[in-house]
Amino acid sequence: MSYGTNVVACCRRDLIPAVKRFIDGMPNPGTCFETPSIYALNRMLEHADARVCFMAAYFLPDVGLVFGADLPCPYETRLLRQEDFAELYLPEWSDALCSDRKELDVLGVGAYDNGNLVGFAGCSADCGSMWQIGVDVLPEYRRQGIASALTNRLARAVFEREKVPFYCAAWSNVKSVKNALRSGFRPGWAEITAKSNQFISEKFGKIGNFIEDEG
């Protein structure tokens, strides 16, 4: 990961020398995350039967923007707590909640149309002081400002609990990046994560297998 002026890397002990050479060979931190460098990183990871899997941008809140934003929601909103999530572990809310680690999902804000949940922002307690926000809106309710309204409301609720909200988006997910900015967040750091080829094939199915076959 990089905060802009540095690179922080975590890897298996046997990969440390190669990773150090990779980082030290770059003219600046940002170059580590550019496409030619990622190709080189993948070649290095071949020896560990792994390759780059996730490429994400993380956003931190601008307190003035979070509390100063005027983001009305066209639907009723409700604050939800962990005990309200049991029936919400569904594909349509997979960015807001994570069924693999339910114990970390702690708070949420839902948008309701005549009692039906149409948008949902949830946050997970990824560490003791910072809670990560994710948001989903049903396709037929998008482009109404629901995502940014829910994200902003949840960020405020997180601050009220004396935690720091943060937000993650895949680099290519421009809509999600725009939502972060509208909701009062600003770029914090960039991150690349490598996973085993088996993990990628299992998680991404045909896409993962295609990439593996092509490699």
Task: Indicate where each model-derived feature is located.
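Conserved GNAT acetyl-CoA-binding A-motif
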Residues: 7, 129, 158-170
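Acyl-donor-binding surface of acyltransferase catalytic domains
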Residues: 1-85
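Long, contiguous binding/interaction regions
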Residues: 13, 108-110, 125, 191, ...
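A conserved beta-strand-loop-helix scaffold within acyl/acetyltransferase catalytic domains
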Residues: 100-107, 112-130, 135-138
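Conserved acetyl-CoA-binding loop-helix of GNAT-fold acetyltransferases
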Residues: 133, 143-157, 178, 182
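Conserved beta-strand-loop-alpha-helix junction that forms the acyl-donor binding cleft
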Residues: 167-181, 186, 193-198
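Conserved catalytic-core motifs of GNAT/GCN5-like acyltransferases
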Residues: 52-61, 186-203, 209-213
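Conserved acyl-donor/pantetheine-binding loop and adjacent beta-alpha core of acyl/acetyltransferases
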Residues: 49-52, 69-116
